[in-house]
Amino acid sequence: MSATSTIVMPGERIAAIEELAKSKRVILGPGLRRLDDTVVASKAGPLRHKEPGTFWVDNYQRRYIPARGDLILGIVRAKAGDLYRVDIGATDTASISYLAFEAASKKNRPDLIPGDLIYARVLNASADIEPELVCVNSVGKSGKLGVLTDGFFFKCSLNLGRMLLRENCPVLAALTRELPYEIAVGVNGRIWLKAHSLKETVALANAISALEQSGCAEIDKICGNLGDFLQA
C-alpha cells in the first residue's frame, strides 16, 4: 500500500486513474466516483493507492459510508425472512442472507440471534439500495469471516480502522511481538480482540486505543507500557 502526495478536492478530476483504467481493472473506494468515462473526487484528502488498482481518498469522517469490498464488523439486530438486519454503523442497516455463510443451505442455516457480532465484507453498496454483506470469499470459504464469539468489542475512529487494515501494519506487528492474540478490524471503526486472558485482552485494547492520540510514531513506547502493565 502506498500513499501519494496528491491532495484532492471534491469535484477534482483524477486523470491518472482514468489513464490506468484503460489498461487494467481499477477499483474506486470511498471519496472517489465514476462519472461516465471520468473519475472525480467526492471528498477532500490525500489520494491513497493499494496495488494492483485500488484507489480511495483518506478523508476524516465521523460516520461510516459503505463501499464495495469493505471489511466491517456488524451487530445482528433482527431476522427478516431469509435475511438478517445488521447494524454496521452507517445511516442505513445492512442485510445478509443466511446463504452468505460457508456451507449454509436451507437445511443448514446459521443460528444468528440479535446481538451477535459478525465479521463480513460489503458485497453491494449504493445510494439506492441497502448495503448487502457476505461472510464468504469468491470460492465460498469463510476464511476469517463469520460470527465472532467471546473476545472484546470496542470502537475506534474510521481512520484508525483503515490504518490497522493496511498490509504489514507496524502496529499489529509490534503488538504481536509482545503477546499472541486474534483481531478483526473493520473499516467502519469497530474492532474485535481476543487474547489468552481478560487482562491481556484489555491491555491490548488500551494499547490500540492509545494510537488515536499518539499515532504510529509512539508504537515502541506503547508496547513498552503494555509489557509493564502485563508484569504488574
Curated annotation (Swiss-Prot):
GO terms for molecular function: RNA binding. CDD domains: KH-I_Rrp40, S1_Rrp40. The gene is Rrp40. GO terms for cellular component: cytoplasm; cytoplasmic exosome (RNase complex); exosome (RNase complex); nuclear exosome (RNase complex); nucleolus. Non-catalytic component of the RNA exosome complex which has 3'->5' exoribonuclease activity and participates in a multitude of cellular RNA processing and degradation events. In the nucleus, the RNA exosome complex is involved in proper maturation of stable RNA species such as rRNA, snRNA and snoRNA, in the elimination of RNA processing by-products and non-coding 'pervasive' transcripts such as antisense RNA species, and of mRNAs with processing defects, thereby limiting or excluding their export to the cytoplasm. Belongs to the RRP40 family. It comes from Drosophila melanogaster (Fruit fly). One of its GO terms (biological process) is mushroom body development. SUPFAM superfamilies: Eukaryotic type KH-domain (KH-domain type I), Nucleic acid-binding proteins, Ribosomal L27 protein-like. This is Exosome complex component RRP40. The keyword rRNA-binding does not apply.
